[in-house]
């Protein structure tokens, strides 16, 4: 039995190594020796893909070297087989790290005494929804005629993890090789098949994948439970999720939100004029020509005037005057943007980050028109020029609108026209990670409108990088009226270069950049002049696009150059996980969408405030993620041992729990100022404030009210309003017993008890239930055990959640003018039917009737079941009717 208060440990199946043991091997699956490789051809090969669609693609592509495959099985149990190989697939992750158990062998309780939960060895469990698929894959892997296994899961960390967790949970010890695919075209699959990688080559990436998984598990589970324990210490269950990537991402948003909330606008003025010349009119804006940038004053700009008198004076002395015009023209060039990686594509494509990823995945996997999308590289391998030429030729021969631009690239030669070239901005082995940039494959397919938009972006970018720079002529025009200067800027496209691919033409300026011409020394008359009243604006809230950019470039927040380099490549999370991180923050209600903007909610701000109070820098700073990514990269290259990395993670996990526990203990002894309001019960001045309560200081007065209600802290201002006015609200941020958020007002009743007040008639929809309100724990007809509570108006079964009853099914205490007793309510839940209840009153006829109540736990619907009438009464009625006839 584990001593109370000790860290939780887990046992593990034989054959699974301890990731922290110094003597542990770094790979469970034995490495293929020359002898085993020679024996590969004697039996069959099992090929495991990550998804069923990839399994089907492999069966078609590999039919050329291995022979035609026959489809076997049906429904979800389909796999492909021929004389040489069997092809099956996972459905994403099939296996997960096991949740820890408590000291008594039951679920781990939510209290500090069992934290930190650090397993001696990590154990695996099937994911329940995918267990049938796992059994099928393992059944094939254990067949005696299978003598080697090829990992054909997605080429990256997660693909390694999915495959190796399957091997480990099944204790499969057969030689393994790796199929590393850059795209899903037949040629790419065949090329990868001809150059299978050994397990030894993949060992370092496998170690990094497992470390990523286990460290996220340790930090996420322990931080979430520690913060939840802290926030629930006054009652309720206020789950507070935290994690390695999620919390630092939230911190970026929270910092911006704090800037916005603290922002105070500063008024300023601008003077705008319209000038007339022989060829027409042009606008101008007054500037201070002596202005110099001041880093200590970011609000200062050359056109801003900080007092109205100065602005009015400028207008007065320039009104109706004539100025002298001078111009300066400069040539500017703009090079084509680099090829897309996933983050850049998600930022620029017109859909949500999650939506863009789903579209890109469909273009890759379903339609096979682009290469692997979950990449963090914007470069191609240096030996990929022949592939690029072939892809460009296929686009040129297609009926795509951009085909003519692809033809121009293929036909080009000199530097000033589009042509294929080996620029380091395109081809660089040092900048290619697991995968290269997203480019088209040259294949075409029928796409939806949304898919076509994203595909067009990728194709145009692929062609544009081989075009020369766009060249502009930048014009800066100054109009001087004695000591006052007005500035006007314009820009015209001279040579479109790569912008030609996007439909731009030379000699054209956009509306605001177009300037009427002036001759040398020409005068300009002031035809209109005005003073504009402006205010400085707060920083813009993050959008998904700008947040993705901040996540990718979080290295800018770090001073350490080596860590910043890792962050520049990976940032917070990876390209494949950033969209899920944003969606996770939204699902947990830490942030919310408001049009394109992302707002941080009150609970999100409170979490970051809590993390800062605990001084856990790694959870509110990108430094920890940069440190982890740097070390995981080292591990991928064989420069860091797996056990050394995990030792640091365990130390960090202990630190998180220790600091959370200490803050909870310190809070008990914290002194608070009195609440300067009279006691609502006895009228004595001032209420004592503790960590948990507001209470009267008079020894003979029993008034006491909780500071934390339904998982929400009642602020001093809110408490003062409640105790003086007997009501406050409505307030947001409450959470029910099952962590469902709700809004409500609070009232202090005649007995000085705090109650919820709801705007609608459904006053008990989100009631916070206590153990004092529990009337029984019963077993339903289907064998499930549930707790039944009572409130003033209803009986509640919180475990039975439906779409209409997200806070749990409720049964009214009064149904058709009849009170339902607790005994009948328990019987209704236990058997699905009450005894006959007499005295219901029909709302329609106003007549009384007797009936059983019935209960359907699936939807919470209450019905009536009418008892049969006595036979003799029915017979007598029939006889009477006959006599009347």
Give residue ranges: language-model regions.
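Hydrophobic, low-acid, alpha-helix-prone terminal segments
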Residues: 19-25
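Intrinsic low-complexity, disordered N-terminal segments enriched in polar/charged/small residues
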Residues: 8-10, 34
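Metal- or metallocofactor-binding catalytic centers and their adjacent structured scaffolds
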Residues: 295-338
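Intrinsically disordered, low-complexity regulatory segments
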Residues: 34-213, 217-221, 354, 424, ...
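C-terminal or mid-to-C-terminal helical accessory/interaction module adjacent to the motor/catalytic core
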Residues: 143-144, 188-275, 330
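Glycine-centered, phosphate/nucleic-acid-interacting loop/turn motifs that mediate DNA/RNA or nucleotide
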Residues: 367-368, 589
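Basic, low-complexity terminal or inter-domain segments flanking catalytic cores
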Residues: 39, 43-46, 130, 141, ...
